[in-house]
Amino acid sequence: DIDPRILLGGIIGEQFRFFSNYSRETFKNYFEPLKILASLSKFSYGIAGLKPETVADIDKNLTNPDSVFYLGKQMEQVITYPENSDRTAVRFARITDTKDSYYSYLYVGLYMKQIIAQWERAGYDISDRAGILATLYNLGFHYSKPNANPQIGGAPVMVGGKQYSFGALAEAFYNSDELIDIFPKQ
């Protein structure tokens, strides 16, 4: 399982990036209830800023036992599609649904689980490394290169006039008491 605070770190990073001119207090006041998280546009979609090609890769990794991101037979059917459906269209509808964020959260969790699986296969445990997982979530599968000294980074995000990297923002959130009553540390 993915610690909900770690998963949320990636989503909050996307939200801060989208609302980069807002202060932390503004973000907390408007988005804390998690009822009106922004649906991002242009190249990434939904509350989690998912790219359609990343979602397609997550799906492929679920069913490809040769993939370094494969989670095992027990996870192959975690994402299903209606028979004879256009999977691309269904995926897009799922990650852009503003009334139901289930698939956005599911895909973020699956992405992180797949990254963790890749690193575990290489002998490294990053399952509790919020900043590293958020960095890799921000950068994408092709930047995930397991090593003994992973670095927090990613896109720059301005918060209250201060610049953070995407991963550093997630790490700061994870270690803070922000939303701790709703998302306690596991």
Task: Tell what function each PLM region has.
Residues D1-Q186:
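Catalytic glycan-binding domains that act on GlcNAc-containing polysaccharides
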